[in-house]
Amino acid sequence: AKTIAYDEEARRGLERGLNSLADAVKVT
């Protein structure tokens, strides 16, 4: 269960990073 929770957190972090990256590209 710990691995699954960590995986979900990592996935969320990745999505957040991609979103911020896309936002930065849009702004630029």
Swiss-Prot record:
The keyword Chaperone applies. The keyword Lipid biosynthesis does not apply. Its EC number is 5.6.1.7. One of its GO terms (cellular component) is cytoplasm. It catalyses: ATP + H2O + a folded polypeptide = ADP + phosphate + an unfolded polypeptide. It comes from the Bacteria. Keywords: ATP-binding, Chaperone, Cytoplasm, Isomerase, Nucleotide-binding. One of its GO terms (molecular function) is isomerase activity. Coiled coil: none annotated. Transmembrane segments: none annotated. It is found in: Cytoplasm. It is an enzyme of class 5 (isomerase). Together with its co-chaperonin GroES, plays an essential role in assisting protein folding. The GroEL-GroES system forms a nano-cage that allows encapsulation of the non-native substrate proteins and provides a physical environment optimized to promote and accelerate protein folding. Forms a cylinder of 14 subunits composed of two heptameric rings stacked back-to-back. Interacts with the co-chaperonin GroES. Belongs to the chaperonin (HSP60) family. This is Chaperonin GroEL. The lineage of its organism: Bacteria, Bacillati, Actinomycetota, Actinomycetes, Mycobacteriales.
